[in-house]
Amino acid sequence: MAREFSLEKTRNIGIMAHVDAGKTTTTERILYYTGKIHKIGETHEGASQMDWMEQEQERGITITSAATTAQWDGHRVNIIDTPGHVDFTIEVQRSLRVLDGAVTVLDAQSGVEPQTETVWRQATEYGVPRIVFANKMDKIGADFLYSVQSLHDRLQANAHPIQLPIGSEDDFRGIIDLIKMKAEIYTNDLGTDILEEDIPAEYVDQANEYREKLVEAVADTDEDLMMKYLEGEEITNEELMAAIRRATINVEFYPVLCGSAFKNKGVQLMLDAVIDYLPSPLDIPAIKGINPDTDEEETRPASDEEPFAALAFKIMTDPFVGRLTFFRVYSGVLNSGSYVLNTSKGKRERIGRILQMHANSRQEIETVYAGDIAAAVGLKDTTTGDSLTDEKSKVILESIEVPEPVIQLMVEPKSKADQDKMGIALQKLAEEDPTFRVETNVETGETVISGMGELHLDVLVDRMKREFKVEANVGAPQVSYRETFRASTQARGFFKRQSGGKGQFGDVWIEFTPNEEGKGFEFENAIVGGVVPREFIPAVEKGLVESMANGVLAGYPMVDVKAKLYDGSYHDVDSSETAFKIAASLALKEAAKSAQPAILEPMMLVTITAPEDNLGDVMGHVTARRGRVDGMEARGNTQVVRAFVPLAEMFGYATVLRSATQGRGTFMMVFDHYEDVPKSVQEEIIKKNSGE
């Protein structure tokens, strides 16, 4: 089957925002106007097309990034609706990795919110071009120009309106297009009847002022336009649009639009902007990867003629078709029934069927082309971030970075029958979500699950009960602490057993030094002259890795330590891998006496929004929880406080804040970094973990 839409006419976009800014409603309207659905589903009524998991419909939030495809103005638009809640950051990250552009949805009353900052930062890291949609213009307190200013103040973004609203709150009735310099007036509730007319007299001065600002801002990014502007020449609409497109694709400029998805206003113009200003796969740099055979960098330009290369960005278990692997095709063509090579795992995989997804309904297709996003059935070994390529033309594409979990819970099955089911359920959920970890405590036999926050684990335990019918008891949440060394030291590990039978002998000298934060464990072999034979070196490293998994103070994993093996000795007969593994673990224990071991705790960036009258209470909460205030901002008669607070002190805070502010205060938190716990807290943790 031939390609239906050319690469120039393909857009892969994400819709991202702070929780509750109206992302899913916006996506719903896009599907409605592009003819994908005939009846609009409201998120707050639990009937949205994109939020198809039961928990999403109950909670009114988006958890998984549903992928869907739509058509607009002769173009194919593949849309990924991403969650706005911080506990589901990985969903945002992995969708940004495979998108070419994004629409950032703001709540026009609140402007840039904490999670907007997080997703904006992630999109900047991945170099994703964006347009901004100031939604909820019909809401009380909606302020378009405040929202635009918040993009400058909080994100330092070169963002400028290409539209202005006509009226706001209940009186929001249309939009001024600053490129055509025309007004679009909505005359019915479905937003399908739009009158284009001259700009109302009372808005002409404002429109001229913002048109001038727009031209100036765009000219700053474009030399040719700047020359025309300075010489006072007329700049045509076509020239202005072309310059906005170039600057947006180069991530130098962000067009800002306005509307109300709920009231069906502004969505079609936003779709036009997706086509006009966001890139096709041909507009962005060709993806790079490493050839596993030569270790050399290779590129894969977006073209059907190139060898097939794709990235798996999400695994999902579908009750009807089983395991689905979502993938983005960067180059080449793939037919169902053919074989590909998973270069990340070195395994050959058969593509059973290829499905094009629409939220949770699906359509089977025979072929996918460069630039497409689809799901495959039948892949057994592929996980998030794996590269799938032509067997004859291997390449490993840059993978998806997975943040470390910060919170853990103990789960135990209620009955023997639940035990086996729970193992399978947890394995499947972990396959779908790389930030969800499942471990078994070797000493107690307990199953411990870890994730990005309480809501994250709540949803997963809930899915285990609903989808896999597993009944389980869940313990109280625990913090994922870490351990490290704060000083350098040298230590010997000597292990000798020679009492009848085959003896054991291992002897090592290791220098331990603190590593940079986030660098993890690094091992260096500095042995000269074979005092420790080469075949035992990996055993020394393995011995250290295994011992570090259980720490030296309270049994927490050790991070950010360098170990340099520089001396030792061996016995011709009695030395073995096991002996050197044990010797290495003894060296670590010995080092702990003088390397100033410390326990680290996750610090959260907490953003608390509360009425001004309650500011004193909020500051008191932060101090009482060992937190430190990082900044404050007044918004009308509310105060926004940003602070770093240990995760251990944040359990149950929602209830405290609610009662202190009569339910008017809210907070968001996102993991920021690890920090040493105070000595008194460290002693308590050690005491608790040694069972005293």
Swiss-Prot record:
One Gene Ontology cellular component: cytoplasm
Pfam families registered for this protein in UniProt: EFG_C (PF00679), EFG_III (PF14492), EFG_IV (PF03764), GTP_EFTU (PF00009), GTP_EFTU_D2 (PF03144)
Domain tr-type G: 8-282
GO biological process: ribosome disassembly
Molecular-function GO terms, alphabetical: GTP binding; GTPase activity; translation elongation factor activity
Predominant localisation class: cytoplasm
Binding site for GTP: 17-24, 81-85, 135-138
Keywords: Cytoplasm, Elongation factor, GTP-binding, Nucleotide-binding, Protein biosynthesis
Family, per entry: Belongs to the TRAFAC class translation factor GTPase superfamily. Classic translation factor GTPase family. EF-G/EF-2 subfamily.
PANTHER family (UniProt xref): RIBOSOME-RELEASING FACTOR 2, MITOCHONDRIAL, TRANSLATION ELONGATION FACTOR G-RELATED
Physiological role: Catalyzes the GTP-dependent ribosomal translocation step during translation elongation. During this step, the ribosome changes from the pre-translocational (PRE) to the post-translocational (POST) state as the newly formed A-site-bound peptidyl-tRNA and P-site-bound deacylated tRNA move to the P and E sites, respectively. Catalyzes the coordinated movement of the two tRNA molecules, the mRNA and conformational changes in the ribosome.
Protein name as annotated: Elongation factor G
Biological source species: Streptococcus agalactiae serotype III (strain NEM316)
